[in-house]
Amino acid sequence: MGCYSMGFVGRKAGMSRVFLEDGCSIPVTLIEATANRVVQIKTSDVDGYDAVQVTVGSRRSVLVNKPESGHFAKAKVEAGRGLWEFRVEKTQLGSYSVGSEVGLSIFAVGQKVDIQGITKGKGFQGTIKRHNFRMGDATHGNSLSHRAPGSLGQRQTPGRVFPGKKMSGHMGAVRQSVQNLEVVKIDVERCLIAVRGAIPGASGGDVLIRSASKI
């Protein structure tokens, strides 16, 4: 069993840069970090594991189905734009209660964090863009195979395409994590947190922020 810690749900706001005291500028990603509301506390005795379920933001009532509406009503929490869970240690459950809020106080400047998001969708792409294949020669004798993927394998034996073969297909729109990003700045008044470097996804996408699991 690993070591779990509370996380935070934010929204990617975009990228900027921050000047350090020595005059160097570093790229940072700004994350909108409004307070997360606790919807449910899950315990190993009842649910089989210990976790804190949170929501953030708001959603129109017509977009909330009946099961979700009842779930939020039971917790007496305004319906948010989604539900997320963070595994925590059993000893940490006492720090949270249904209806309470989780803020940026769980992070500190200089701390290393892992951030998870959904990458930008690229649609259907060929092997050159999707898997960094080499292009065919752009010269005499090559008329239709400049971006062709090439051979898929052998002939009658084995007579099939092996699973996992790199081919054309849908690219992007997958869950991806970036580890060990440094927290550069925390602005509590503006509900912003700045981390060094880039994070997955487009501006406006939800991201999960956790304490770094590997340092």
Swiss-Prot record:
One of its GO terms (cellular component) is cytosolic large ribosomal subunit. Keywords: Methylation, Ribonucleoprotein, Ribosomal protein, RNA-binding, rRNA-binding. The keyword Protease does not apply. Belongs to the universal ribosomal protein uL3 family. One of the primary rRNA binding proteins, it binds directly near the 3'-end of the 23S rRNA, where it nucleates assembly of the 50S subunit. PANTHER family: 50S RIBOSOMAL PROTEIN L3, LARGE RIBOSOMAL SUBUNIT PROTEIN UL3C. This is Large ribosomal subunit protein uL3. The gene is rplC.
